């Protein structure tokens, strides 16, 4: 029976770098990963990207950056708690401490949304719809079927791997040059768009252009290969995923109350089974005299702590199945029934009350129109470069290409690579920049 080994899974070697880091007082390789991520421009731009509510005028609701920071905090706690319990395993590397594992998961959590386009998951769907229409008109005929799938099923997770390993810092030479362990902890869907799982789950983790990077990471870490460019998950991915689930299930509801979409009483009733009445830090129970924001904040902290403990315990109990690459579903499914119900009920309330709200529909329709305008201009310009035989492109295409900066494709690249670089540019946009650019392309110059 094939089993993954912790001493390989926790590899501190950096991708794109032939030698190991010199020991540095006060910073392990995994803490350096965190620092590289948090100082990167791609991470900084998350501050102006949608979490759930596009272009909200309420500064109290979450964006991708605040969400990612909160997820990373929960992920760090999960990583430390799990490692404290399993570090006695025979193959556990002596140089890896629980706080190192916390830093790995924390870094993976920081990066988990780094490839998302403007306007959040709706932006992903809008891009897919645009390419489906473009493809129906013969626009992608210069690409192979597998290459077409990368665009027809545009995926922020695959774009995220590309951002981490290709685009930031050392462009196309390892990118951020993160450790293999952190990259493995980030790889939520270690397969390509042509894999049947990509269709059934609607997710995949690497583009055709980056499949050898996926293979390099998987082979270095000793992930179990399940098919052609298809591996099982790194066990720590489950902690990153749990941290994300915990945060967005609870925080989405808090934002819903802030925006007046949900009643505070509904959220309190949903979360109350975990802890009953929540006490103030000074020992006073919460009453109607407290502001709802304080009441929810105190309850949120208690709920998250409970869910972290439940997921950490589930990981410890399922460790061997995780190392065999056999665990089905997510960690929440193996947590205690109370934790499962809280997460499930919170997600259901968000779907029914928040994601279907009229204000969200209005903002998403506007976002779709803006992305369509941007794609209408940049994609044909990129394909013109890909088809160019005489070093000349049209005057209009030159103008679009000039706006792409370092992402501008060079004459002579394949149409597919030209489109990948174009999507690097578009996916990296913030909501605000996309709004401004779409307006300018529409003639709204003043």
Cite the ranges covered by each PLM segment.
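Intrinsically disordered or highly flexible coil/loop and linker segments, enriched in small
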Residues: 43-47, 136, 169-174, 192-196, ...
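C-terminal subdomains that position terminal phosphate/3'-OH groups for nucleotidyl transfer/ligation
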Residues: 278-417, 429
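A short small-residue
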Residues: 49-59, 349-354
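Acidic, low-complexity proline/glycine-rich segments
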Residues: 31-44, 335-339
């Amino acid at each position: 029976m094939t089993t993954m080994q912790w001493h390989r899974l926790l590899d501190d070697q950096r991708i794109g770098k032939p030698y190991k880091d010199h020991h540095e007082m006060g910073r392990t390789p995994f803490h350096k990963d965190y620092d590289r991520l948090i100082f990167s421009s791609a991470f900084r731009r998350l501050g102006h990207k949608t979490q759930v509510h596009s272009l909200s005028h309420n500064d109290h609701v979450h964006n991708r950056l605040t969400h990612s920071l909160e997820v990373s905090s929960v992920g760090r706690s999960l990583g430390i708690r799990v490692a404290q319990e399993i570090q006695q395993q025979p193959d556990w590397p002596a140089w890896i401490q629980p706080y190192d594992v916390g830093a790995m998961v924390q870094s993976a959590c920081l990066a988990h949304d780094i490839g998302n386009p403007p306007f959040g998951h709706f932006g992903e769907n809008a891009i897919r719809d645009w390419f489906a229409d473009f493809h129906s008109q013969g626009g992608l005929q210069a690409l192979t079927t597998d290459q077409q799938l990368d665009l027809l099923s545009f995926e922020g997770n695959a774009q995220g791997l590309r951002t981490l390993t290709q685009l930031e810092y050392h462009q196309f030479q390892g990118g951020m040059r993160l450790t293999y362990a952190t990259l493995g902890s980030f790889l939520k869907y270690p397969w390509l768009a042509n894999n049947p799982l990509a269709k059934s789950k609607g997710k995949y983790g690497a583009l055709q252009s980056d499949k050898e990077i996926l293979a390099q990471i998987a082979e270095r870490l000793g992930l179990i290969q399940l098919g052609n460019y298809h591996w099982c998950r790194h066990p720590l991915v489950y902690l990153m995923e749990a941290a994300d689930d915990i945060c967005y299930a609870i925080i989405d509801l808090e934002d819903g109350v802030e925006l007046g979409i949900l009643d505070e009483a509904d959220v309190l009733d949903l979360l109350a089974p975990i802890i009953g009445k929540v006490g103030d830090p000074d020992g006073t129970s919460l009453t109607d005299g407290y502001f709802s924001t304080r009441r929810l904040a105190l309850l949120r902290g208690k709920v998250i702590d409970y869910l972290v403990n439940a997921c950490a315990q589930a990981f410890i109990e399922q460790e061997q199945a995780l190392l065999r690459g056999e665990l089905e579903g997510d960690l929440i499914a193996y947590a205690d029934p109370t934790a499962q119900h809280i997460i499930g009920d919170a997600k259901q309330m968000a779907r029914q009350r928040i994601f279907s709200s009229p204000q969200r529909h209005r903002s998403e329709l506007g976002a779709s129109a803006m992305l369509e305008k941007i794609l209408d201009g940049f994609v044909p310009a990129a394909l013109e470069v890909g088809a160019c035989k005489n070093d000349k492109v049209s005057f209009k295409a030159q103008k679009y290409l000039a706006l792409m900066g370092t992402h501008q494709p060079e004459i002579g690249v394949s149409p597919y690579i030209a489109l990948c670089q174009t999507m690097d540019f578009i996916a990296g946009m913030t909501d605000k920049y996309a709004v401004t650019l779409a307006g300018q392309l529409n003639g709204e110059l003043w």
